[in-house]
Amino acid sequence: MTSPSSILLYCRRGFEKECAAEILVQTQAAGISGHVRAKENSAYVVFVAHEPEILANRAARLRFDALIFARQRIFASGPLADLPVDDRITPLLDTAAGLQRRYSTLWLETADTNEAKELAAFTRKFERPFAAAAAGLLGGGPQAPRLHVFFLTSTAAYLGYTLPDDSAPWPCGIPRLKLPRSAPSRSTLKLEEAFLVFVDRPETMLRPGMSAVDLGAAPGGWTWQLVRRHIRTTAVDNGNLDPALLDSGLVTHLRTDGFRFRPSRPVDWLVCDMVEQPSRIARLVADWAADGAFRYAVFNLKLPMNRRYEEVERCRGLIEERLAAQGVSHRLRFRQLYHDREEVTGFLELVS
């Protein structure tokens, strides 16, 4: 078998520098030398390993869920350039057969840019004949690697694989969520995606009858996600809340400052989408956690224009330092979700 020579990462357009910085930190920590190729506004980054065999041997040390800005991470070969127009399939199949013996499924993808989306008609047309030709490599079962073909143009592509338990479960790393008609704002999709990304035990972590606090709740997009799961919610905001949420019987609206409010007793969930300096939000969440005021928290950090990766790591440090001083066991993750913009979403779980 051939070792993958690179790591392909999808990201939000404009965040290539941050995505490149964190994959360099992660690979260096694993003792994997290489360099990155990151073109501004391309919506993808490539880490090129200097020694592919070391990348293959140490790939298990590179956890996808530890990355912040990557939507998807693919162990890849390539790029395959100048694919013959009359036979793109053969070189792609040869490369796929060299990387893995069997795959569970096939995803043809492009970058999340307007320019790359012009390839959509080509990939739709190409998918059926390529899948038919690759049938002998597919059908490896749900735990087999996924086969990805990432088209740069109609004649150039990266080909690689992801492992189902260490990757995003959606093509292009993008969950296709539909805005519910009754939701008060589009921000509701951020919390829905956050639950999909961070909550690995929904039957126990998002049970009906749980309690929550939503800081900066108005007009109620995040509260709506809690109410639809029958979670009793205290919505804290000086602004107006969607009347339908109040009619649900599950919401108490408090017109007060989200930074001053504290619940009289611990709640199951804290969610926070207040527009404020990221370090101030991080300290607020750390204060609640140090007091044992919640079990789980989802919060957004609005990022500055510059040094965005460094700012997230600074906020991570603020939370980690405070909880370490209090002896609070926890799990902390960050991810720039598809429905995030100039922000990242944090998830904090207190471990008893």
Swiss-Prot record:
Keywords: Cytoplasm, Methyltransferase, rRNA processing, S-adenosyl-L-methionine, Transferase
Catalytic activity: cytidine(2498) in 23S rRNA + S-adenosyl-L-methionine = 2'-O-methylcytidine(2498) in 23S rRNA + S-adenosyl-L-homocysteine + H(+)
Pfam families: FtsJ, RlmM_FDX, RLMM_N
GO terms assigned for molecular function: S-adenosylmethionine-dependent methyltransferase activity
Class of the enzyme per the UniProt entry, highest EC level: transferase
Entry EC no(s): 2.1.1.186
One GO term describing the cellular component: cytoplasm
Primary location group: cytoplasm
Keyword Transit peptide carried by entry: no
UniProt xrefs under PANTHER family: RIBOSOMAL RNA LARGE SUBUNIT METHYLTRANSFERASE M, RIBOSOMAL RNA METHYLTRANSFERASE FTSJ DOMAIN-CONTAINING PROTEIN
Function: Catalyzes the 2'-O-methylation at nucleotide C2498 in 23S rRNA.
Subunit structure: Monomer.
Family as reported in the entry's similarity comment: Belongs to the class I-like SAM-binding methyltransferase superfamily. RNA methyltransferase RlmE family. RlmM subfamily.
Record protein name field: Ribosomal RNA large subunit methyltransferase M
